[in-house]
């Protein structure tokens, strides 16, 4: 079991890796975890809509038109789960009596992304089965943004990272690692219907593992997350029925990736979506519902499985209030 611990630390990231991801740390944050964004090819850096916008680009938050809560669940092959819960709100303080000019608009978001995998086949040094193991990764977000001008907003997002492998230490306890990451974003809407955004993601993000509780002579190892740069653009035609989005993603260790998508909206009914996450197509839809006079949206996304794997399904509930 002890010899298996280091293998787990190295192996688990590959379960979340997309093609070309290389199994780098933090892969669960780069694979898409919400149905609307997933169906749009994971291109969302320049879209100021919904609570999830604060994770893709925190600078979009002052441009939200309502408060929103969201629940999202991903159904993945290989006994994996990927879930997200979040809340976001625009902040528009009222001007005090006697003050000139408009108050500075802002936005706030919080969220939690949880990734888990179970039924990992544990083996001893002779290759004999010992037990089934599991792993969970978590990212807790808080994002804040300001809009200093009509056409420009800036934002920052801090995230606490926590990785846990239970039942693997000498006393059958958990091996854990924690860290902190920082995202920085800029957003602009220079023309009607057109928006652009840039996000610098996973600055400082890393896992530091110490295996003293597993081995007689443990080691300390650090795995840094790839530092991501995303630039995106979005355009909604004047009659509002079509949204076109595109992102270009690059990092300090990975090859560039592109993300494109389109959303066709039928007013008050729903939307159809199609996207391309680099070389992986995605499809989905949204249904608009009224619950107690408030807008609720049910979103679904479908992504074909890689090679022999089953397809991926993502379902999200969004509530505006």
Predicted segment positions?
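Outer-membrane beta-barrel porins/channels
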Residues: 18-37, 74, 81-321
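Short strand-turn segments of transmembrane beta-barrel domains in outer membranes
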Residues: 42-45, 67-78
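N-terminal periplasmic accessory domains that precede
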Residues: 52-63
């Amino acid at each position: 079991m002890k010899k298996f611990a280091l293998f787990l630390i190295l192996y688990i990231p590959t379960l979340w890796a997309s093609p070309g991801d290389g199994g780098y740390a933090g892969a669960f944050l780069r694979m898409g975890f919400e149905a609307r964004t997933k169906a749009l090819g994971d291109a969302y850096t320049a879209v100021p809509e919904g609570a999830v916008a604060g994770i893709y680009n925190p600078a979009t938050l002052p441009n939200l038109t309502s408060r929103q809560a969201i629940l999202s669940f991903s159904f993945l092959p290989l006994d994996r789960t990927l879930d997200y819960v979040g809340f976001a709100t625009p902040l528009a303080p009222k001007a005090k009596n006697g003050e000139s000019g408009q108050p500075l608009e802002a936005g706030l978001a919080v969220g939690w992304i949880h990734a888990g995998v179970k039924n990992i086949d544990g083996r001893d040094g002779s290759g004999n089965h010992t037990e089934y193991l599991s792993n969970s990764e978590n990212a807790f977000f808080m994002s804040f943004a300001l809009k200093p001008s009509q056409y420009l907003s800036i934002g920052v997002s801090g995230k606490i990272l926590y990785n846990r492998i239970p039942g693997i230490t000498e006393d059958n306890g958990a091996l854990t690692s924690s860290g902190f990451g920082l995202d920085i974003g800029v957003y602009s809407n220079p023309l009607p219907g057109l928006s652009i955004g840039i996000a610098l993601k996973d600055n400082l993000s890393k896992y530091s593992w110490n295996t003293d509780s597993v081995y007689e002579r443990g080691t300390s190892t650090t795995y840094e997350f790839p530092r991501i740069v995303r630039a995106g653009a979005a355009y909604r035609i004047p009659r509002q029925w079509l949204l076109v989005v595109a992102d270009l993603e690059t990092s300090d260790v990975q090859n560039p990736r592109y993300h494109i998508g389109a959303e066709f909206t039928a007013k008050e009914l729903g939307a159809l979506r199609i996207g391309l996450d680099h070389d992986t197509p995605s499809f989905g839809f949204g249904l608009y519902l009224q619950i107690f006079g408030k807008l609720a949206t049910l979103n679904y996304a479908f992504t074909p499985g890689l090679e022999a794997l089953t397809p991926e399904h993502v379902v999200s509930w969004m509530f505006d209030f």
